[in-house]
Amino acid sequence: MVVMLGPSGSAQFTVTSKAPGAIEVPADVLNAVDVPMHVTVTRDDGGAVLLAVAPSADARAILATSAVSTVSAVHYPAGSLDLRSSGTGALPDLARADIWRLTARGAGSAELLVDQGRAPETLVVTSGDATALKDVTVTLTWADHAWFFEALAMGTLGAVLAAFAFTDLWQGRVSNDPVVAGQPQSRRARA
């Protein structure tokens, strides 16, 4: 665990969506850990990207039956995400909606830091207009510097406990030699 987190104490997960449509990071992923999440989105064709965060009910309502790829699972320590596709409808112009609490735009890529203060929330990734996205890479990163030290402390504690257990087992093996009364020490050693 210490090696996986590294001194930065961060866990990073990535997926590339090949399906056209928006990408949704629901509350059970976005708000899974009580530390801010850093979201980076890169679009292969260099087109416009919009990241937007809204209360989950509002985000679900605006996406309705649109084509959406939803992050459905996070795999640690593999660092991957699963996507589940749903809907077939066209996307509304999400940029004009007044439901978004946080937004970030970019050409080819965009980044957003999502705090956990207003959970449950949903993150939506789109082109910013009605154009469907495809070949988009989403990277989610949670970072907490304390995680590294907590993992290091647990690893050290585990090593100390293992050393004590090994020592106890070794001493128990040596002291279980039967001592026969009346035999000299040298005979016991040969027997």
Where do the PLM segments sit?
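Extracytoplasmic/periplasmic regions of membrane proteins
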Residues: 5-141
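Juxtamembrane interface at the cytosolic side of transmembrane helices
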Residues: 142-191
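Hydrophobic secretory-pathway targeting helix
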Residues: 1-7, 161-162
